[in-house]
Amino acid sequence: MKFWTKEEEQDIQKIEKNPVRSFSAPDNVDGAKEIHTNLLAPQLGHAIIPSDAQSEGTIPVKELIKSYRALAEYHEVDDAIQEIVDEAIVYENDKEVVWLNLDNTDFSENIKAKINEEFDRVVSLLQMRKHGYKWFRKWYVDSRIYFHKILDKDNNIIELRPLNPMKMELVREIQKETIDGVEVVKGTLEYYVYKQSDYKMPSWMSATNRAQTSFRIPKDAIVFAHSGLMRGCADDPYIIGYLDRAIKPANQLKMLEDALVIYRLARAPERRVFYVDVGNLPTQKAQQYVNGIMQNVKNRVVYDTQTGQVKNTTNAMSMLEDYYLPRREGSKGTEVSTLPGGQSLGDIEDVLYFNRKLYKAMRIPTSRAASEDQTGGINFGQGAEITRDELKFTKFVKRLQTKFETVITDPLKHQLIVNNIITEEEWDANHEKLYVVFNQDSYFEEAKELEILNSRMNAMRDIQDYAGKYYSHKYIQKNILRLSDDQITAMQSEIDEEETNPRFQQDDQGF
């Protein structure tokens, strides 16, 4: 931790030398726990532990993550999560899972080659080919993911060790000073608190005693990526996950499925009705007589919502609750009849409705949800079209990938600076131009490109009669076919070359 402590000392020195002052702290975009103080940490390594008390309406991180993980165990939610993760992390035999695009950066070719080498090293440390699916799914479900950077003697990362998100907390210490009677913000110092124990320490306990179960970690020692979704007031925001929208529809779907099974078990079979002749027995003895007969033939069936099993004492599923009605002497005598079962037990439209509602809450096209006559999914065939929902879903997945790429770019930044490949200033100037490209499904991409090209060809045929009269050929190339100037020049050069090539010349029959 000595390297990270030194880095934190440099951050403190930057705060001291920073001439910028403001009455407001920078926006809290990472959901950090804020501490306001007029003094920085007197001694690095000693924890400054925030109070365990939660603001009104704030859900503890541990409870939030537990609720998301429990939700992900429902098979309908798990299927929906798999749709998202499969779209974000694509495995193909001849392609990498993720690669780096440096075309828009200001680096030289030599520097770009070194950056790509370090990028491959980081991808290898994360084992994206093997564990990329697991990391992305864990990040999506928990709404956050942490890795500890473990260094060798040369300060190179040799391992990225995953940490339990329920034991981590990001703290932002807001350094203030008073100028002319006005309290202004001098700077901010961020660090992590790792809670070794789940025991909730009282706020009055000293920092020394609290540090026995919690300790402070410099910010640069941890790789942290979160969903980017916030809830709570501006003074105390906290991170929520993308599954937060799915909690209500998922619980409604599960409740409806359980209720539907119970209803069908109760109403599907025909029930027996026993009319028991009690003769002239007194009311009390008549009731005892009916109860005796009932106990001899009674069978109660219980449905277990946890396992989906039907349990009873006799293990006979054909029998349910029966009706026992006494009859007085002079009636028809003892009789056993049946009540018909329920009707329309095959209707599951309400279940399919809540299943579609769950997919909508998770921003997944409802065409991928299972329906009554098909299993769901994307179907491309003759005349098939890519719907607007699919395009919106593709954009949503790209936003998720952009949030997740911090898992790769954070350790990449460390490697580049430690090995003196680039400076921190060069990273700050170019990191927005550096693109982490995730592999996409080839079949889907080809189908999308073919559909776009087909639409452009149809539009070009419709406007062909007006070419050279109302619209120039260059206008058609740039606005209908969407070709760039370089593409137009290259295309014209290829056309001129093919005109002199006998292979592309037509014969007398037009071939």
From Swiss-Prot:
InterPro entries: Portal_Gp20
KW Ion transport (keyword) present: no
Coiled coil: none
Cellular compartment(s): Virion
Keywords in alphabetical order: Capsid protein, Late protein, Viral capsid assembly, Viral contractile tail ejection system, Viral genome ejection through host cell envelope, Viral genome packaging, Viral penetration into host cytoplasm, Viral release from host cell, Virion, Virus entry into host cell
Any one biological process term the GO annotation gives: viral release from host cell
Major localisation: virion
One cellular-component annotation, GO: viral capsid
Superkingdom, taxonomy of origin: Viruses
Family statement: Belongs to the Tevenvirinae portal protein family.
UniProt function note: Forms the portal vertex of the capsid. This portal plays critical roles in head assembly, genome packaging, neck/tail attachment, and genome ejection. The portal protein multimerizes as a single ring-shaped homododecamer arranged around a central channel. Binds to the terminase subunits to form the packaging machine.
Subunit structure: Homododecamer. Interacts with the large terminase subunit. Interacts with the major capsid protein. Interacts with the capsid vertex protein.
Name this protein carries in UniProt: Portal protein
